[in-house]
Amino acid sequence: MSWKTEPGVVRYGYPLCLLSLSCLSGAHAEEYSAADRARARPDSALVLEDVTVSARRREEPAQTVPIAMNVLAGEQLNDAGIYRTEELQQRVPSLLVSVPSPRYTSYGIRGLGSSSYNDGIDGSVGVFLDGVYLGRQGMSLVDLIDIERVEVLRGPQGTLYGKNTTAGAINLSSRAPTFAPEGSGEVSVGEKGLRQYRGTFSGALIDGVLAGRLTGYDVERDGLIDNRYDGSELRDQNRQGLRGQLLWTPSETFSARLIGEYAWQDEQSNVFTASHYSQTTLERSAFVGYRQLPIDPYARRVQQDKPNAVKTLQTGATLELNWLLDSGATLTSISGYRDWSYDASQDGDGMALAIVDDATVRLDQHQFSQELRLADSPNQHLDYVVGLYYLRQHLNRAVGVRFGEDAAAYFLGDRPEIEQFHITPAMIPSSLLEGGQQSFDGEQRSDSRAAFGQLTWHATERLAITPGLRYTRERKQAWLSRSVSGLAPLGLDLVSQLGGNLLRSTALGGEYYRRDAIEESSLSGQLALSYAFDDDLLGYASWSRGYKAGGINLDVVGPTVEPTFEAERVSSLEVGLKSAFWSGRGMLDLALYQADVEDYQALTNRPPVNEFAPPIRDNLINVGKVRLRGIELDARLRASERVDLRLGIAWSDARYRDFANAPCSPSSAQWSCDLGGKRLFNAPEWSASAGVDYRYPLEHALELFSGLDYQFRSGYYGTLEGGPGSYQPSYGLTNLRLGLRRGDRRWEAELWARNLFDEDYITAVYARLGAGDYGVLSGAPRSVGMTLRTRW
């Protein structure tokens, strides 16, 4: 896409372009040659940089692609202090990332995301690292170091990206090795003992034939949560990683790129501050003489007698091969193998009581993927890409829960018989549950095969038509077991024995085993039409169909709960505009969409098995229909050589159309509710991102720079049932940076403040031990620090 001057915009100035859509229209009747355009912009410093993307599996300018997307270059990530994938939402209003823990990481785009805490459900946003799909969303929690660019594609992307992209896809592309020597180093220090080190070096190993690149990072920070039980600090940071690459170019028609990765994390995380206590919890706590902390979701304090240690280890290898064939077509092979392990030992009750003495979770994910693609532009009217895809995944899971000496008295503390017969905690034998061990073991294997193709027919110089299809065949098989051990004989009288056995059965369950399998096929596709009204204005309309795989419920379920669930399918209609104005100094994109979701996957309640047990949310089924509607606006403007402005706004109306068996708020005393017409959880109505960057040149080739970023989200519920304490109020965050650097950015010294005004906010909600109890993950407080960077 090229740029031309629009007299009306120049006359009235850039503020109107951000406040009115009129800058998108106008009669661009005069056609300029390349030389004319060069004369029209004598100062290239005033022109926004061109952005190249690979969203359609080929390199092309972002403004010519009929897909709603956000693109962030690696330098933009560094400037904004975006170091982790979950921080991308600072610049992408339609993206919401919830990270209660790596195991339960959830990405949502336009209000649609993963709907439950269950190892058997897949994500709705596909995350791809150097072309390799990451099978579990917790695998995507990587440090964004040495990144070429990040592409966030909004809306279903099933044709080229496959299953589990019903809400969108995130492409992470690392920088490739270079033959010219280059490198960078970065040191950051800040409050709470923050120490962050990042470094990269690249260069030729065999001149013109073999190049290498090595990247590493080390991050440490003290905890943000005060544990009132022993004075320790929780929710710290401690992670390290390495990425090594080789690029082999033995000829002009062949290249091979090998990437090896290692990432380690060992932190006291997965810690939640209480936001609501149910009446049951208050009665039980009072019975055993335990004083709960006052409700204050922003206090960043807990009271628990066990650590929350979470360790993850991820290793991976990617091999990308590219052949330029005699016909001019390019054949690409991407092979990927990844291992990911999650090992958690945590306080299962969130209190300083010996209710759950030990709670452990061990997950091991192994996956292999292979993609073959053939891409070509045989003539000026046709571009195409066709391919084959294979993905194999293997998940092992081991979960253990051991009850402590306070468990029996606590769980019986709200029974009416306690007061009726004047029972005290000392009268309840701890042996009823103490030492009882639940072990949940399981395994899931899945295989996915697909064939796909997409072509773009340039019917005229301005009109392009892009159809695409993908056929996917999916098979999953799994087994799950529960065993109970560690219980001593009760040795009680007959009546007490019966009551004790009932309590044990309710709290621990019995032996359990099941094996399930599913096999399904799906046809995804799209049809897009784009029209270039002139060189600066592209309009498009598209229909797309996405697919999220069905699966197997990897929780223990009762006889009334289906062990498997069907695939979730999304049909989306979208119209949009992509424009440039003011001789290339500004860009403004607009998208309007509606998506209809069929067989929406969610967890619902099953009725209680007896009067001791509350409703259990383990019924993972297809509940009905969801509709998403919204408008998105993205704008960038180079106001002068010194000032850049940006603005992103997203309005989303995400609602259940049909959800009759939804879990109710625990305070309602109902087992199921009809949520038809209600808003989805984790789906704020309004989201926005805005920012300004300022540069001021000094003598001796130096430059002062500053940046201000603002992010806003309106309030929304963080859980499906919307219980008291699960609402996340609206908030706005401001980040500021000030610094000095060389004009060529060979070195930089920067002072920064994140969450400048120390705003209280919530990033995730979690259902705690008791029905109706909620904990929240509060956002980080204000943090001030300094970063030094050098490049060569």
Where do the language-model regions lie?
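C-terminal beta-signal and adjacent terminal beta-strands/loops
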Residues: 596, 711-719, 740-792
